[in-house]
Amino acid sequence: MTGEGAARADIAWPPGDGRRALDPAFLLVLTHGSGGGPGSADLLAVRDAALPLGAAVALVTQPYRVKGRRAPGSPDRQDAAWIEIVDAVRDAAGPDLPLVQGGRSNGARVACRTARATGARAVLALAFPLHPPGHPEKSRAAELALAGTDVLVINGSRDPFGIPDQAARTRVVVLDGETHALSKKPETAGATAGAWLAGLPGLVHP
């Protein structure tokens, strides 16, 4: 429960020996875009790439979507609810686990804006919506900088919401032919995210 109402988090655990899951090496918390849900192909592909690395992966449905609304409302209230959600997921998965958080589209924005508050080691931003379609002057690039940590952006070359520029701690990967949905070859997004996670210092058990 958050100040905005109930959220839902489905946690998948790293595969074990057939009897029980392995103790996770890190926690990956992911969420959806404005009107979507956590079952999008790109989010599932990232989950499937992260589990063999030893991640516990939480797919989060935010309170406004649990209520059936499509618009997230105030960013401040959305961010406050997200911080509460991450705290609860960490309690369930292991409060001392290194945290990586992320999402697609609007969820990527939330993950960037709250990374400092949650203590995230890194942020994964799928289909980061740099600006509203047709309005490049309304840039949201500053939200990427708010993360204050390593960020991986995975966007499609045909995304009408634009593509961010590389920055000191922001790596941008552009998938040729993909739109904002990243649904043409979601396994490519998953593999890209998995390789990045595997390369983050101290995150994956040797």
Label each region the model flagged.
Residues 146-148, 153-155, 159:
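Short beta-strand/loop motif that positions the catalytic acidic residue
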Residues 103-111:
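Gly/Ala-rich beta-loop-alpha elbow adjacent to hydrolase catalytic centers
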Residues 1-98, 110:
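Serine-hydrolase catalytic machinery in alpha/beta-hydrolase-like enzymes
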Residues 178-191:
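Catalytic histidine-centered segment of alpha/beta-hydrolase-like enzymes
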Residues 62-63, 125-133, 156-158:
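Active-site nucleophile loop of the alpha/beta-hydrolase fold
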